[in-house]
């Protein structure tokens, strides 16, 4: 079974969000199950030179884009036993950031066409083409509408994964007419038209044989108006080919037993070593070294989606508790400034690192006691899974993947791996934080809770089995 992942980013080459983690980890897990996965992505100038040096020029072709042919170099390389193809075109991919350019519609129209034009030249017979998010949604649409009549493509099945419905790739109609060479018959509400523009993600949903969302709860949520980003009606229409498969984490990267970034490695049976990480974290940030004061952390993009309005509303009330708080992340200036002000106001209790630091993030996961993630919506979420693996108990809102992966602690049965609240309400969150702090001070209960969190399986294995089953169903 041969699968081609068409993605706009992938670890270890280049990363702006969770899509890159999925594209980097899932193929390795599928390979263990006997599924051959290769990955095709743009050859961005941002890719580290040593990774590009590991690739060789496989072939040069031309890609028809509207009235002109564009150069396309196909580079080929291997990392961790996975074959990668990089689509080389400096005009489109020599930029200082992955996305957010005036010509993104043209850039990813080119990339979508390049993926399809490359397939006959890859020395790899593709059974299933698996596209991800808006950037490669049109690969599946163009395959169905423009390429499937060709014997080289007619057998290929398609899967499309929605990682975040909020970002849809909406562009002026000229992109469809001039670059993708699609006529008027595609510019109406049953096809690509979307409030007077063209919507790439809509194309992926319509044309793919199967659609997945990155958690079962998110799959349900996006069919309702509140979460549906104006595509809820379309998703209800195609509900029969929509499923939810929760993401995992790469346990070769996030594993407290082997993590070289943390001060002391540990497992569920050596939690005293976790306290060593806590002391190291307190020293790093200049916090008082108090072993019995819980550290609540957030490693997050500082955006509205992450529920930071709730945190802002009751932050001073949280500070009335005997806690320390560490925030690591960057994003909207209003949230950056708020947390910097809180660090100034509570110098003995609050520390903030604006930006991202991979090594420090690992130390925060290892050294904290509680991990706060009160998202407005969360397709899957990576932070809570990493926190659980490190025995740092998550406090989450019951939405998307948070609802699927965090089971609220039940003092009657002793079951659970975290704490959760239902409504997007600051005082519901505050109550849940206080409840978590209360149990933190009940050491036998807390130790049991941490062990339960750490001994669950957060790897990609279960997810990979679900994807393998999905691919297999398409080929029967």
From Swiss-Prot:
Q: Does the entry feature the keyword Transferase, yes or no?
A: yes
Offer one example of a GO biological process linked to this entry: glycogen biosynthetic process
Report the EC number(s), separated by commas if there are several. 2.4.1.21
Q: Which SUPFAM superfamilies match?
A: UDP-Glycosyltransferase/glycogen phosphorylase
Pfam families on file:
Glyco_transf_5 (PF08323), Glycos_transf_1 (PF00534)
> Which pathway is this protein engaged in?
Glycan biosynthesis; glycogen biosynthesis
Give the domain of life: Bacteria
* Classification via Gene3D superfamilies: Glycogen Phosphorylase B (3.40.50.2000)
Q: Enumerate the catalysed reactions.
A: [(1->4)-alpha-D-glucosyl](n) + ADP-alpha-D-glucose = [(1->4)-alpha-D-glucosyl](n+1) + ADP + H(+)
User: Which UniProt keyword terms apply here?
Assistant: Glycogen biosynthesis, Glycosyltransferase, Transferase
Q: At which positions is ADP-alpha-D-glucose bound?
A: 15
Gene Ontology molecular function? alpha-1,4-glucan glucosyltransferase (ADP-glucose donor) activity; alpha-1,4-glucan glucosyltransferase (UDP-glucose donor) activity
NCBIfam families attached here? glgA, PRK00654.1-1, PRK00654.1-2
The UniProt family comment states: Belongs to the glycosyltransferase 1 family. Bacterial/plant glycogen synthase subfamily.
Q: PANTHER family annotated for this entry?
A: ALPHA AMYLASE DOMAIN-CONTAINING PROTEIN (PTHR45825:SF11), GRANULE-BOUND STARCH SYNTHASE 1, CHLOROPLASTIC/AMYLOPLASTIC (PTHR45825)
Biological function: Synthesizes alpha-1,4-glucan chains using ADP-glucose.
In Swiss-Prot or TrEMBL terms, this protein is called Glycogen synthase
What is the organism of origin for this protein? Bacillus cereus (strain Q1)
């Amino acid at each position: 079974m041969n699968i081609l992942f068409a993605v706009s980013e992938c670890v270890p080459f280049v990363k702006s969000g969770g899509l890159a983690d999925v594209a980097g980890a899932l193929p390795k897990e599928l390979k263990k199950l006997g599924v051959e996965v290769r990955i095709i992505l743009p050859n961005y100038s941002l890719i580290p030179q040593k990774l590009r040096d590991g690739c060789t020029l496989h072939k040069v072709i031309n890609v028809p884009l509207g009235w002109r042919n564009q150069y396309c170099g196909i580079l080929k390389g291997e990392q961790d036993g996975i074959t990668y193809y990089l689509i080389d075109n400096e005009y489109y991919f020599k930029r200082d950031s992955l996305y957010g350019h005036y010509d993104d519609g043209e850039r990813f129209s080119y990339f979508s066409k390049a993926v399809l034009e490359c397939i006959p030249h890859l020395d790899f017979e593709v059974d299933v083409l698996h596209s991800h998010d808006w950037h490669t949604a049109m690969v599946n649409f163009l395959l169905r509408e423009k390429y499937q009549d060709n014997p080289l493509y007619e057998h290929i099945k398609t899967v499309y994964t929605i990682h975040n419905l909020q970002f849809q790739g909406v562009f002026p109609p000229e992109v469809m007419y001039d670059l993708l060479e699609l006529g008027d018959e595609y510019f109406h509400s049953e096809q690509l038209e979307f409030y007077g523009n063209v919507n790439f993600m809509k194309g992926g949903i319509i044309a793919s044989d199967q659609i997945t969302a990155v958690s079962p709860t998110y799959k349900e949520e996006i069919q309702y108006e509140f979460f549906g980003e104006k595509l809820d009606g379309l998703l209800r229409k195609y509900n029969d080919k929509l499923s939810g498969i929760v993401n995992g984490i790469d346990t070769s990267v996030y594993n407290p037993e082997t993590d070289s970034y943390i001060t002391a490695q540990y497992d569920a049976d050596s939690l005293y070593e976790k306290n060593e990480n806590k002391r190291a974290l307190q020293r790093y940030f200049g916090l008082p070294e108090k072993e019995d004061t819980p550290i609540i952390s957030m490693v997050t993009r500082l955006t509205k989606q992450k529920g930071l309005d709730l945190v802002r509303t009751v932050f001073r009330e949280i500070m009335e508790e005997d806690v320390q708080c560490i925030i690591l992340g960057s994003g909207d200036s209003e949230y950056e400034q708020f947390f910097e002000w809180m660090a100034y106001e509570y110098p003995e209790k609050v520390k903030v690192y604006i930006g991202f630091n991979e090594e420090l993030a690992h130390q925060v996961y290892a050294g904290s006691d509680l991990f706060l993630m009160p998202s407005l919506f969360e397709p899957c979420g990576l932070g809570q899974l990493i926190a659980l693996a490190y025995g740092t108990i998550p406090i989450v809102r019951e939405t998307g993947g948070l609802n699927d992966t965090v089971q609220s602690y039940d003092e009657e049965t002793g079951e659970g791996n975290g704490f959760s609240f239902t409504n997007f309400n600051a005082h519901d969150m505050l109550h849940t934080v206080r409840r978590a702090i209360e149990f933190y001070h009940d050491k036998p209960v807390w130790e049991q809770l941490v062990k339960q969190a750490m001994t669950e399986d957060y790897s990609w294995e279960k997810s990979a089995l679900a994807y393998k089953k999905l691919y297999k169903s398409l080929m029967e």
